Amino acid sequence: KECDLKPEEIVAKIKDAGVVGMGGACFPTHVKLSPPPGCKAECVIINAVECEPYLTADHRLMLEKADEILVGVTILMKAVNVTKGYIGIENNKPDAIKLMTEKAAQYPNIEIVPLKVQYPQGGEKQLIDAVIRRQVPAPPAIPINVGAVVQNVGTAYAVYEAVQKNKPLFERVVTVTGKSVKNPSNFLTRMGTPMSQLIDAAGGLPEDTGKVIGGGPMMGKALLNTEVPICKGSSGVLLMNDKEASRAAESPCIRCAKCVSVCPMGLEPFLLATLSAKQDWERVEKEDVMSCIECGSCQFTCPSHRYLLDYIRLGKGTVGGIIRARNAKK
């Protein structure tokens, strides 16, 4: 049925249900739906790109819950008082694009936008640029500064369940996969479930497992053991074999600039990594480390196998703390 709640009532319900960004950041959804003074939303963009290799949780969700997702989108649009919604889906999901386009025919204000297969197309700023051709300035600017409210497709479904069913967010779809996994699957999983249970359900831990990754191969993080619980931002569990998990030794930078050419934010990863290693935090901040989206493209393409993302994450975390401390004194 159609949602007859007022925008503020919708936001309150979403807050009470504990709905957060399901793409991994876990940013509270009710905060995104409450623009700061002076900012006005013009559209809602649903991120259904799922550009990380191996992960298929959002893809599966669209194939099985298309109607519910579209209702969730209309609720999000009503919450921020806009009349236009977009759902961005990469072209490598033709079945999802076809189904969502057919289902969206009854929603004239919602447009399905097929997107080029390109990592990291699912980055918030990259998605906004691809869908509405607007560029979000450097931090502290956020999507609402260009009139966009971006939500993950899983969040749209969670919003539907929260508002229409009064159901809090206590479960999500999680991909369990890997080249050696016997039965790669997507599981509807309750928060707090140990990853070991999901691995068992997918056929057990392969003997040649070299690493267990929480998330995808590009932006995920290696886990110490399989007893780590599933949380709201857990999109997948990736089991890498010994060969995939092996890490080449670092070599000196050869100044090829490949990391610069692939950076979606136009940064200089080689410089940020070098400055972070030297702990030159003032320069690291000046070189705009906070704009890094940690996509890992630089490290993936580096012929010298430099641990660029590791150093940049160190720099970003340190500079972020310095900025917060500085702002607290004001």
Cite the ranges covered by each PLM segment:
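Iron-sulfur-cluster electron-transfer modules
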Residues: K1-A130, R255, V289-M290, E294-Q299, ...
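Conserved mixed alpha/beta catalytic, RNA-binding, or beta-rich assembly cores of soluble enzyme
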Residues: I14-C26, P37-E42, N47-I69, V163-P252, ...
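Hydrophobic alpha-helical positions that pack around
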Residues: T83-M195, A201-P206, G216
